[in-house]
Amino acid sequence: VRSRGLGDVYKRQAIYEGSFENTSHGFRPRRSCQTALTQIQDTFLGTKWFIEGDIKGFFDNIDHNVLIGILEERIADERFIRLIRKFLNAGYIENWKYRHTYSGTPQGGIISPILANIYLDKFDKYMEEYAQSFNKGASRRLDKDYRRIKDRKNKLEKKLKSETDTKVRKDLIDKIKGYYRQMQQMPCVMEMDEEYRRLKYVRYADDFLIGVVGSHEECGQIKANITQ
């Protein structure tokens, strides 16, 4: 019965796999700690602040009724739900000892990582909605000093196109190169643009990382909101 029940769990996993967020990397097909790190490298560009979190004692504090309720949202098979409740009551979640592995494969547990992802998918979706409401602006505005130098360079380049005197052209080219060197040594956009905000989120098992482009005060508010 136990083997048949485990087979049912794996079959049901396919129901959820397609709806899991792209930010979830723990114990999923073709997902690992490495894919989580790659996503951070690719998407946390320009991040000013990091909020690192782990859901302490997560596997010891899963609310069984909440988990069953989440399962019932998509699974109408009462026999399967009863089977999962038996697994929960038998302590399969609490007795599962999570240990990091390079492959991202859980050691010592079978059902727990599947149910944990289903349970934490609610948090992943909450963070996706939170990011959408937090994000502001299409892009950072140009830094004022950078824009001023760029405007001067553009004017000289425009003048250069119509200039025919060799000496004047050389002087213009030297000045343009000077402005270009200045631009390379300064930030092109405003580092703290009040009209631009971004929040990025990645989770691996019960560890997650949030990247914020915004103020320190906004980071404090984010921490307070997700702790609730």
Q: Over which residues does each language-model region extend?
A:
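Conserved polymerase palm-domain catalytic core
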Residues: 22-23, 28-31, 35-227
